[in-house]
Swiss-Prot record:
It is found in: Periplasm; Bacterial flagellum basal body. HAMAP family: FlgI. GO terms for cellular component: bacterial-type flagellum basal body, distal rod, P ring; outer membrane-bounded periplasmic space. It comes from Leptospira interrogans serogroup Icterohaemorrhagiae serovar Lai (strain 56601). Belongs to the FlgI family. One of its GO terms (biological process) is bacterial-type flagellum-dependent cell motility. It holds the Pfam family FlgI. The basal body constitutes a major portion of the flagellar organelle and consists of four rings (L,P,S, and M) mounted on a central rod. This is Flagellar P-ring protein. Keywords: Bacterial flagellum, Periplasm, Signal. NCBIfam families: PRK05303.1. Assembles around the rod to form the L-ring and probably protects the motor/basal body from shearing forces during rotation.
């Protein structure tokens, strides 16, 4: 049974973007590769230190190691320079982070995140100089450089003080080039271990049953070889019948990845504080609860009664939000947008609803 969905709301209101998705079904048939991974096939974190140049006077001004780093960088290029901390307003020190897949090859490009570690006001307009990226073992696997870009838009006209408006964190798309491949020992094992992204006994049981019904007939693997070892792990014992990197082994892995199982959709609300985007399932409901937030007044009734939208109060006193049981998160966010609530207000209210137990969904703030 395929999941049907439609976008039910997309609007821009005072610099705040709201996206909602309505799922008509609570379950969906998904491929195994979409909800789990095979052990050994994973991403690895790499990080490094770098310098951003070309800033329009928004760089570091009181960060001594920035001038020292720039001086050493120029020295390696054969240029002698005596920079002082107050002469670095067009450069900034940053930390660089990226993820590298296990099977990345030399020359592959990766996106990198660049974050200011000094007192720079903004990295907008800056260029990251060539910087090595290493793992925890201090081995260089990639080199990053390029123009820093930013997503979303500022909310200054709404009076928001979100740290996302300062633009001290940006992305260099395809800015890192892989120079060294990761060590691989995936094929050394005589088993395949499947790891679910989320612990769920219902999904685990469905996967085990599906694998046991398909593998014996096509690949000659007995049902007893498929063993669940935890709420999120399944072990498939292959023995020596499959040679490493053989066509039969690769076909087996492909068949496992493309098995389809019916899963339950997990209610989730995702908020990106930097860009002001909210994504949620349309059927996420809220129990009856009272919420107070200074300067706003909202009253929402249940689905069988007329809704009453109220704007900002004239008096700067605390206001009450009456949210009836079965009201959806989408209704609440839409109402808050109508009365001019900021991103900070919406995040604070949703966090309070979650902590009180009124919001029955996972809340993720990015």
């Amino acid at each position: 049974m395929k999941s049907k969905y439609s976008i039910f709301c997309m609007f821009l209101l005072r610099g705040f973007i709201f996206l909602g998705t309505v799922f008509s079904l609570n379950s969906a048939e998904l491929r195994l590769k979409d909800i789990a991974r095979i052990e050994g096939v994973r991403e690895n974190q790499i990080t490094g230190y770098g310098i951003v140049v070309g800033l329009p006077g928004t760089g570091d001004s009181k960060t001594p190691f920035t001038s020292e780093s720039m001086k050493n960088y120029l020295k390696n290029l054969g240029v002698e320079a005596n920079l002082k901390p107050d002469q670095t307003r067009n450069i900034a020190s940053v930390l660089i982070t990226a993820t590298i897949p296990t099977y990345s090859r030399k020359g592959d490009k990766l996106n990198v995140v660049v974050s200011s570690i000094g007192d720079a006001k903004s990295l907008e307009g800056g260029v990251l100089l060539q910087s090595p990226l290493k793992t925890a073992g201090d081995k260089t696997y990639a080199v990053a450089s390029g123009v820093i870009s930013f997503g979303g838009r500022q909310e200054q006209e709404r009076g928001s003080s979100s740290r996302g408006n300062k633009k001290t964190v940006g992305v260099v798309h395809g800015g890192a080039i892989v120079e060294q491949e990761l060590d691989q020992n995936f094929y050394a094992s005589e088993r395949v271990q499947i790891q679910l992204e989320n612990q769920d006994f219902t999904t685990l049981n469905a996967i085990v049953s599906k694998i046991r019904s398909i593998l014996p007939g096509k690949h000659g693997i007995g049902p007893e070889s498929v063993v669940p070892i935890s709420p999120s792990e399944i072990n498939i014992v292959l023995g020596k019948s499959f040679e490493n990197k053989s066509d039969a082994f690769l076909t087996l892995l492909s068949d496992i990845e493309n098995l389809t199982v019916e899963t339950q959709t997990k209610p989730k609300v995702v908020i990106n504080e930097r860009t002001g985007v909210i994504v949620m399932g349309g059927n996420i409901t809220i129990e009856e609860v009272a919420v107070s937030r200074s300067g706003l007044n909202l009253s929402v009734t249940d689905k069988n009664r007329r809704r009453n939208w109220l704007g900002k109060e004239q008096e700067p006193t605390k206001s009450s939000f009456l949210i009836e049981e079965s009201t959806s998160v989408g209704d609440v966010v839409e109402a808050l947008n109508k009365v001019g609530a900021s991103t900070k207000d919406i995040i604070a209210i949703l966090e309070a609803l979650k902590k009180s137990g009124a919001l029955h969904a996972e809340l993720e703030i990015q």
